[in-house]
């Protein structure tokens, strides 16, 4: 049964995942650029000019290319911060009262006699997936046609594509429970990342110490993600899988999904190296940042 059916309004209703559910994904993919355009024009532009130039200097004659770039990049980070905050709240609303929020074993068993991969999803979990899937579908195109071209463009594109594939695959192969926790892990640290970047663009270096970013990145992406989430998807799931019933599809689901999850771990480590370098530079400069976060410098080929 697809998400467009009436039962979608009942968030606790359980049903098996279906390709029909993805009928709403294009709606979200169109929703995000529409909202971003309105926020860019009526909110972010004014806020950026106020914070970057100061009160009474929002309109500057003979505006330089550097100032225009700072405004554009500030608006990009403001938009991402708004999305990640909304997605984090959504993910917590969906997962907080579920048994697998605190016990990874319930990724694979329950409720009742349901055992992975024969598990149903609640409508609220399906909605979270379509919301996030729509954003990353839009983000792939935004990175090409809308965003400032940065030196880590290839890595960012790989991340967006891998995330979009993970969302589609994990949904259809019944990995959505663990997937919702992975989404919550990523969104939490990304909120602090975008706040730090906005503070850099606005010249508020004291706010750009990235202490919360570093702390959340270490705890969520470098400790909890590999030692709890990946441990559960690599080992714990094997203890519950009916190997006789799922001789073919079980191993296929297992290896494909875990390969993508480990690719995300590699990206976590890569970005942590960049964040760590920035942290060291900030300490040496006594709180001042000479560069930006996570390879945020412009591509040398940008006009």
Curated annotation (Swiss-Prot):
Q: Which residues form the TLC domain?
A: 72-284
For this entry, list what GO says about its biological process: ceramide biosynthetic process
Q: Taking the first listed entry, what is the main subcellular location of this protein, grouped into a coarse class?
A: endoplasmic reticulum
Q: Which spans are transmembrane here?
A: 19-39, 81-101, 127-147, 153-173, 212-232, 255-275
Q: Under the cellular component aspect of Gene Ontology, which terms does the record hold?
A: endoplasmic reticulum; endoplasmic reticulum membrane
The record's subcellular location field reads: Endoplasmic reticulum membrane
What membrane topology term does the record carry?
Answer: Multi-pass membrane protein
Q: Which Pfam families match?
A: TRAM_LAG1_CLN8
Q: What is this protein called?
A: ASC1-like protein
Q: What is the lineage of its organism?
A: Eukaryota, Viridiplantae, Streptophyta, Embryophyta, Tracheophyta
């Amino acid at each position: 049964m697809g998400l467009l059916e009436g039962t979608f309004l009942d968030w606790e209703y359980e049903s098996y995942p279906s390709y029909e559910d993805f009928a709403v994904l294009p709606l979200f993919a169109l929703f995000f650029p529409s909202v971003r355009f309105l926020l860019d024009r009526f909110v972010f532009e004014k806020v950026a000019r106020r914070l970057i130039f100061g009160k009474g200097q929002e309109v500057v004659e003979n505006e330089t290319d550097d100032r225009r770039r700072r405004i554009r990049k500030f608006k990009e980070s403001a938009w991402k911060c708004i999305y990640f905050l909304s997605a984090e709240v959504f993910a917590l609303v969906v997962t907080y009262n579920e048994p697998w929020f605190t016990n990874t074993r319930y990724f694979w068993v329950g409720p009742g006699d349901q055992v992975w991969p024969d598990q149903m999803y609640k409508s609220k979990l399906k909605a979270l997936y379509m919301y996030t899937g729509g954003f990353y579908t839009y983000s792939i195109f935004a990175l090409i046609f809308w965003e400032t071209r940065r030196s880590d463009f290839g890595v960012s594109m790989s991340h967006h594509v891998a995330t979009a594939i993970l969302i589609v695959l994990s949904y259809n192969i019944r990995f959505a429970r663990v997937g919702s926790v992975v989404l919550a892990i990523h969104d939490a640290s990304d909120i602090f990342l975008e706040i730090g970047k906005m503070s850099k663009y606005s010249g508020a270096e004291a706010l750009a110490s990235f202490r919360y970013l570093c702390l959340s990145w270490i705890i969520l992406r470098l400790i909890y993600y590999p030692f709890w989430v990946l441990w559960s998807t690599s080992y714990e799931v094997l203890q519950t899988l009916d190997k006789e019933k799922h001789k073919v599809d079980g191993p296929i689901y297992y290896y494909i999904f875990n390969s993508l999850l480990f690719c995300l771990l590699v990206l976590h480590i890569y970005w942590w190296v960049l964040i760590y370098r920035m942290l060291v530079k900030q300490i040496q400069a006594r709180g001042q940042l000479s560069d930006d976060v996570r390879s945020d410098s412009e591509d040398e080929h940008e006009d």
